[in-house]
Amino acid sequence: MNYILFGGSGFIGTHLIHLLLKECVRPGDVIYDLDLVMPGEEGVVPGIVEKNDGVQYIRLDVRKPIDFEFVPTPEDVIFDLAAVHRTPGHPEEAYFETNIRGAENVTAFAEKYGIRKILFTSSIAPYGASEDLKTEETLPTPNTPYGISKLVAEKIHQIWQARDPARELTIVRPGIVYGKGEHGNMTRLYKIGRAHV
């Protein structure tokens, strides 16, 4: 079985790799981490992202057609974690180019190799700015380029799934993601709170 992680060197991906190695991988299974950055390079989570035995690290840009050498199996699963996600902080076209083009290329790769399972990490951003309680039935009304790009990427994945009833798609819309090695808003808020105690 192949566990194929696009964007596997990011915060979620590195924790997922640790979990897969600990709980899921059997002899003969392979984890592929396909990302623009590799463990030990600038831009990855220090202290969390290190090279792991049993993981094949491949430098890859999801904005371009995807192809790499591997032996597909019927059980393979893709984790599509690749994204430009900090908002604000990037030109608008960066969100669309990476998040939308990336979704097109990942689903084309899955189609080419007959991979029937994708887990796509979206965001709470497609819901838009609102203080209302969010549910799976809440109408998405994104109001940022990031939110729009993630909603379109969800639709690209849903179209891929709709083409074959044997395909399985899970879309996750996390709110705030935090934990060991994360240096975003929750960590900054926590540090400010501790400084004033």
What does each model-identified segment do?
Residues 6, 34, 78-82, 118-124, ...:
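SDR active-site strand-loop-helix element
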Residues 3-26:
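N-terminal Rossmann NAD(P)H-binding glycine-rich loop of SDR-like oxidoreductase domains
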Residues 161-171, 175-196:
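NAD(P)-dependent short-chain dehydrogenase/reductase
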Residues 25-41:
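Conserved glycine-rich Rossmann-like NAD(P)H-binding loop of the short-chain dehydrogenase/reductase
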Residues 149:
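Active-site helix of classical SDR
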Residues 104-145, 165, 170:
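Conserved Rossmann-fold NAD(P)-dependent oxidoreductase catalytic core, especially the SDR/UDP-sugar
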Residues 59-101, 109-112, 127:
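NAD(P)H-binding glycine-rich loop region in Rossmannoid oxidoreductase-like domains
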